[in-house]
Swiss-Prot record:
GO terms for cellular component: periplasmic space. The keyword Signal applies. Part of the MsrPQ system that repairs oxidized periplasmic proteins containing methionine sulfoxide residues (Met-O), using respiratory chain electrons. Thus protects these proteins from oxidative-stress damage caused by reactive species of oxygen and chlorine generated by the host defense mechanisms. MsrPQ is essential for the maintenance of envelope integrity under bleach stress, rescuing a wide series of structurally unrelated periplasmic proteins from methionine oxidation. It is an enzyme of class 1 (oxidoreductase). It catalyses: L-methionyl-[protein] + a quinone + H2O = L-methionyl-(S)-S-oxide-[protein] + a quinol; L-methionyl-[protein] + a quinone + H2O = L-methionyl-(R)-S-oxide-[protein] + a quinol. GO terms for biological process: protein repair. The gene is msrP. Gene3D superfamilies: Oxidoreductase, molybdopterin-binding domain. This is Protein-methionine-sulfoxide reductase catalytic subunit MsrP. Its cofactor is Mo-molybdopterin. Belongs to the MsrP family. It holds the Pfam family Oxidored_molyb.
Amino acid sequence: MLIRKPADHLPSEITSESVYFNRRQFMAGAAGLLLSAETLAGLAAKKSPLSQLAANDKPNSLKDITSYNNFYEFGTDKSDPAENAHTLRARPWSVLVDGEVAKPRRFSIEELLKFPLEERVYRLRCVEGWSMVIPWVGFPLASLIKQMNPTSRAKYVAFETLQRPSEMPGQRQAVLDWPYREGLRIDEVMHPLAILAVGLYGNALPNQNGAPIRLVVPWKYGFKSIKSIVRIRLQETMPATSWNMANAHEYGFYSNVNPDVDHPRWSQASERRIGEFFKRKTLPFNGYAEQVAGLYRGMDLRKNF
């Protein structure tokens, strides 16, 4: 059976246990592949440094998590990814890790699934002002990066999404400069909260949620957590990122969740948790300030937004 990773979260923060286990057999998008029983049984049981959620947090349904998405490669409406992502072929799949490393390497998704997996129940805060709580399955990004033996020149890490317009119909439109690109500083990448997710609710990722592998950085706005990754490149200079290239005035490189720094067109002081009627206050760093604020000590977070 699935060994759920204990964390400082209340039972009300995720979908109820009965729903969770009844849903474990849903098929993961077009690939239709479940994480193996051996993989599930191997989920780590040790604690991780996760912050507590507020007592009034309410669960998100599996339906919400898999039907309310931003994934412009499949369309710009929230329902488009669930409707259109069946066209994505998530197998075979590989991720190239190159740049400032001892030896570049291409990993198959099967090789990546051999990393010790664990469940991480994280908040997700979208820059648009809505949020969810999601139980991801994945492994620390740092474990992959350490294996690559970065050089001393590796100051940043660039990520790239698959570009395949035949399977990603949104890429046929010039909504963004495809492929989708994101980036982090190397110390952000090495932080234990940053993970590469390969599943949710104990199953392989549905296509609309970023199959077969995506980044999850819970203290940043959701667009930083790039989906359907095909390349991870370590480099000396700050990488170009898609939304920053599209509108640098509205989307900064760091994009840490910050209720004191508004988007030019709306406030970031509060958020709407999907499934709730009333808004709630947004927490600095999405509630993970105790763990990550030290990464930005001495920085002007208004200037470096």
